[in-house]
Design a protein with these regions (language model features):
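Pre-Walker A adenine-sensing motif
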Residues: 1-14
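Conserved catalytic/switch belt of AAA+ P-loop NTPases
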Residues: 88-110, 114, 124
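Interdomain motor-coupling "hinge/lid" segment immediately C-terminal to the ATP-binding subdomain
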Residues: 105-106, 113-115, 119-219, 245-246
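Conserved lysine of the Walker
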Residues: 30
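Accessory nucleic acid-recognition modules appended to NTPase machines
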Residues: 172-336
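Hydrophobic positions on the alpha1 helix immediately C-terminal to the Walker A/P-loop
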Residues: 33
Length: 404
C-alpha cells in the first residue's frame, strides 16, 4: 500500500476538529485513504462508512439525527458529501450538541470530489468546525523508495499521471484506456450531476485545447473563437474545471513592481497523465517527440512542488512584458521567496531574464529543477536541486509547521 503524505496531517486534524473534509478529484484515492485511517483506530472505535451515491447507504440517512445519535461513539465517514448539501446544517447541530457535552473532535470525515470553493457554498454552516485537506494524485515522494527503479518509476509517474489506477495499471496501454474512460465519465456523468448544463463535446474540446497549451498564458479570447462561444463562457468552463481540481490557474506575481508585468494566469491541466490522455499520448517515446513535452514537464514539476509545500504557501509565476520570467514563485510562511526555474535538459542553463526577475522580486533562494538527479551549484547563486530532494525540503518545512 502506498503511504499518502497527508495521512499524518489528517490524523492530527481529526484530533483537533469535529469534522475534516478530504477534497480531491474522483478516483484519486480518498476512500482508500479514509479506510486506511479508520484501520488505525481500535476495533471498538472503528469507523462507519457511508457512500452518499449508494441508495442503501443514503437510506440510512433518511433520519440523519437519529443515525448520528445511534453512532455517537464512532467516526462517521461520509463519501461524496457534496451530493447531499442539506446534510451540512444537520452536522452543525450534531457537532454543537456534542461540543456542549464535552466531545470536541474526531466525529466526521467528509469526502468530496470538489474544491474548497465549491464545497464551501454548501458548508458555510460548518465554519470553525471543519478543516480541509486536499488529496492530490500520487506525487514523487509517495512512491516506494527503490533506487534501482527510481528513474523508471519517475518516468512512469510523469507519463501515466498520479491517479492510482492509472499509475498502477499493468501496462501503458491499459493506463491510457483507464484515463480516457475517466475523462469520458467526468464529461458525460459527473459534471452533469453537479448541475451545469455544458455540452460534453464542447468541454472536451476546451480541456483538450488546455492540454495542448499546457503551461501557457491563458488567452480566453482565442479559445472562445475556436469554440464559437464567448470569453465569459470560457471563463466559466475553466472555473468549473478548477473547482473540480482538474485544472490549475497559476496566477501572476501580484506585488507592486516598477516593471510592466504580464497579468494573465498560466493554465495547467493538473495531472500529467490526463494531459497525455487528452492528446492521445500512450508511451514515453510518443511523449518525448510531442511539442507538449516541455509544458507537460513544467506542469508535472510544479504540481509536485506545490503538493509538498507548507500550508499558506502562495504559488505564482513572474513575467515582465520584455520576457524576464520565473516559472514558479513559492512564497513560504515566514516570508521566504523561492524562485524555481524548470528545465527539461539534464545540463540546464538559465537566461539573463531569470536573474533579472529574481532581482525584481527579491528572491531569497534561486533554484533550478531539471531532469538531472545531481545537486550542484550554478553561477549567480543558483542551486540545482533534484525534484525529489526539493520536495523533501518542502515537506520538512510543512511538517514543522503542522507540528507547531
Amino acid at each position: 500500500m502506498y503511504q499518502r503524505q497527508i495521512l499524518e496531517e489528517l490524523s492530527l486534524y481529526l484530533q483537533e476538529f469535529p469534522a475534516v473534509a478530504i477534497l480531491g478529484p474522483r478516483q484519486v484515492g480518498k476512500t482508500t485513504l479514509a479506510h486506511q485511517l479508520s484501520a488505525q483506530q481500535s476495533a471498538a472505535q472503528g469507523a462507519l462508512y457511508l457512500d452518499l451515491e449508494s441508495p442503501p447507504d443514503l437510506a440510512q440517512l433518511s433520519d440523519p439525527n437519529a443515525y448520528f445519535a445511534a453512532h455517537a461513539d464512532r467516526l462517521v465517514i461520509l463519501d461524496e458529501v457534496q451530493r447531499m448539501p442539506g446534510l451540512f446544517a444537520v452536522l452543525r447541530g450534531v457537532i454543537d450538541q456534542r461540543r456542549r457535552a464535552g466531545v470536541a473532535s474526531g466525529q466526521f470525515l467528509l469526502l468530496g470530489s470538489a474544491s474548497i470553493e465549491l464545497l464551501a457554498q454548501s458548508s458555510e454552516s460548518l465554519a470553525g468546525r471543519l478543516a480541509y485537506v486536499e488529496l492530490v494524485p500520487f506525487v514523487l515522494t509517495e512512491l516506494p523508495a527503490n533506487p534501482a527503479s527510481r528513474l523508471a518509476d519517475a518516468q512512469s509517474l510523469w507519463l501515466r499521471g498520479g491517479f492510482p489506477q492509472a499509475y498502477l495499471a499493468r501496462s501503458d496501454a491499459a493506463s491510457l484506456r483507464w484515463r480516457q474512460q475517466f475523462i469520458t465519465t467526468y464529461l458525460e456523468r459527473d459534471i452533469p450531476l453537479l448541475g451545469p448544463r455544458i455540452p460534453a463535446q464542447t468541454l472536451r474540446s476546451l480541456w483538450t485545447m488546455l492540454a495542448y497549451e499546457q503551461a501557457q498564458m491563458l488567452n480566453a479570447a482565442r479559445l472562445a473563437a475556436s469554440l464559437g462561444v464567448s470569453g465569459q463562457t470560457i471563463g466559466r468552463y475553466i472555473d468549473l474545471l478548477c473547482d473540480l481540481l482538474l485544472v490549475r490557474r497559476l496566477q501572476p506575481w501580484a506585488r507592486q513592481s516598477s516593471k510592466r508585468l504580464v497579468k494573465a494566469p498560466k493554465v495547467y491541466v493538473r495531472d500529467s497523465g490526463l494531459v497525455h490522455a487528452l492528446l492521445g499520448l500512450g508511451t514515453y517515446a510518443e511523449l518525448l517527440s510531442h511539442p507538449v513535452v516541455g509544458g507537460s514537464w513544467e506542469g508535472w514539476i510544479i504540481e509536485n512542488l506545490i503538493a509538498s509545500a507548507p500550508h499558506q504557501t502562495q504559488a505564482s509565476y513572474y513575467r515582465t512584458a520584455v520576457g524576464a520570467e520565473i516559472d514558479l514563485l513559492l512564497e513560504l510562511p515566514g516570508g521566504a521567496l523561492w524562485a524555481v526555474e524548470v528545465k527539461r535538459s539534464s545540463a540546464p542553463t538559465v537566461s539573463r531574464g531569470y536573474h533579472i526577475a529574481c532581482d525584481d522580486v527579491g528572491a531569497t533562494r534561486r533554484l533550478v529543477v531539471s531532469s538531472s538527479d545531481a545537486r550542484f551549484p550554478m553561477a549567480g547563486g543558483i542551486e540545482h536541486v533534484p525534484l525529489l530532494e526539493l520536495m523533501r525540503e518542502l515537506l520538512a518545512l510543512h511538517q514543522t509547521n503542522v507540528a507547531r
